[in-house]
Design a protein with these regions (language model features):
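Juxtamembrane intracellular "pre-TM" segments in multi-pass secondary transporters
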Residues: 9-18, 196-229
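Conserved MFS/SLC helix-loop-helix module at the cytosolic interface between two early adjacent transmembrane helices
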Residues: 72-110
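Helix-to-loop junctions at the C-terminal end of transmembrane segments
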Residues: 74-85, 274-287, 376
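Helix-loop-helix hairpin linking two adjacent transmembrane segments in secondary transporters
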Residues: 112, 142, 149-196
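Cytoplasmic helix-loop-helix junction between adjacent transmembrane helices
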Residues: 116-154
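Intracellular juxtamembrane helix-capping segments at the cytosolic ends
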Residues: 126-138, 333-346
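C-terminal transmembrane helical hairpin of 12-TM major facilitator-type secondary transporters
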Residues: 289-334
Length: 416
């Protein structure tokens, strides 16, 4: 591995040479493990609350703080990848994430668990360092394929996290899930340290100047603002659903355990499978049409969940599964299209553009988790469905609103 541990230049001498498959697999797996850490708790909320002696509303703050920490970490930590060796940042974050997960598994109280959840969210942003690292390492001729593979790993991490955590919590307890996750991240961190090259900093801007440039990009590019706002609104409904699903299934009329809640994560396969398909449509027809179709799918799916409450229990459950497949497909397709829009705005600021998009996305998720737990506590499941449907309608309205097209930002980026 010594031949790939040298400081890496973003402009490789052999633009058609392929990145070694084991390294691509390592990056993809590590991104999946990192992002999975912020979703493990969602199917386990029912057993976590019972095990630690916390109310549904209190334990519902676990995913809220995790998502908030993730958004905060993207905003405050992700820009450092342009200033310092990205390999060192990734490995340090992996160590911090492993420790935060271990602390969560050993938390003696709900207060300690909430602190651990915030730390997990902050450190899990190493996934957002791995994706631009993959783009930098990949030769231009294969960059799209490499980044697509890493994004597939990230999406599968989201998918499998809920399935695995629901199963482990049901059979070994929720604390075991956090400890196993800690060990997996630690192993990935060692592999990344040994397998990745060092990266040359691409700027000498101070930390304050890096953060300040985010505001400049936000003010300058209307397409960035629209993409971020629409994805944030869509994420409100996405997170409101996933952060309350386990509690809803745990109660009447279903009385199901963590395994059932985690199994709903299999519906996320639709999102992972939709990623390359959505990308192809965005390339041929423009990302704009993908964003509109994706948000429309989410609206239809969430509205159908409300109608499903009128059906018998078994039919209700089947309709809920089908609607989960549809809305997850819509959300993930819209995200891929928004990334296509954002990455095409300014090639020299893609990392910071990506940070802004994902800050908005995970701010929406944190808001959705908070509002979802309040809606469930005060209005029941139907209130959660109304919240998710309304936020998705808001996302569609943002995408339908005509956009200004400044000279530095061709309107063609969003046509279709």
């Amino acid at each position: 591995m010594s031949n790939i541990r040298k400081p890496h230049d973003a402009s490789p001498e052999a633009p058609h040479a392929r990145l070694p498959a084991p390294l691509v697999l390592l990056l993809s797996t590590s991104a999946g493990l990192a992002v999975a850490s912020i979703y493990y708790s969602q199917p386990m909320l029912g057993v976590m609350g019972a095990g630690i002696g916390a109310s549904n509303q209190a334990v519902g703050q676990v995913p809220t703080l995790t998502q908030f920490g993730y958004a905060l970490g993207i905003l405050l930590l992700a820009p450092l990848g342009d200033r310092y060796d990205r390999r060192r940042i990734i490995v340090l974050k992996a160590a911090a994430l492993a420790l935060a997960l271990l602390f969560g598994g050993m938390a003696p109280s709900i207060a300690a668990l909430l602190v651990a959840s915030l730390a997990v969210g902050l450190a899990a942003t190493l996934a957002q360092d791995i994706v631009p690292a993959a783009a930098t390492l990949a030769p231009p001729a294969h960059r799209g394929a490499v980044v697509g593979t890493v994004m597939t790993g990230l999406l599968l991490g989201i998918l499998l996290s809920r399935v695995v955590s629901g199963f482990v919590a049901e059979h070994l307890g929720w604390r075991a899930m956090f400890i196993v996750a800690s060990a997996a991240v630690a192993v990935a961190g060692v592999a990344l340290w040994r397998g990745m090259p060092r990266f040359k900093p691409t700027t000498q801007l101070s930390y304050g100047a890096l953060l300040g440039s985010l505001g400049h990009l936000w003010r300058r590019h209307g397409s960035l603002r629209r993409a971020t706002l629409a994805q944030a609104l869509l994420s409100v409904g996405f997170s409101a659903f996933w952060s309350t699903l386990a509690l809803m299934l745990h109660g009447a009329p279903f009385h199901l355990g963590s395994t059932a809640a985690g199994s709903f994560g299999l519906a996320g396969a639709a999102g992972a499978l939709a990623a390359p398909f959505a990308g192809r449509i965005a390339d041929s027809r423009g990302p704009g049409i993908v964003t509109r179709l994706g948000t429309l799918l989410a609206i239809v799916a969430f509205a159908s969940m409300g109608l499903a409450t009128l059906a018998p229990v078994h039919l209700h459950l089947g309709l809920l599964v089908a609607a989960t497949v549809v809305f997850d497909l819509g959300v993930q397709a819209t995200l891929i299209a928004h990334q296509s829009i954002v990455y095409g705005i300014d090639p020299n600021a893609r990392s910071r553009m990506n940070a802004i998009l994902f800050v908005g996305m995970f701010f929406g998720m944190a808001t959705g988790a908070a509002l979802g737990s309040l809606a469930l506590a005060h209005g029941g499941w139907i209130a959660v469905v109304v919240l998710a449907t309304g936020s998705s309608v808001g996302a569609l309205l943002v995408r339908l609103w005509p956009a200004a097209a400044p000279a530095a930002q061709p309107r063609a980026l969003e046509q279709g």
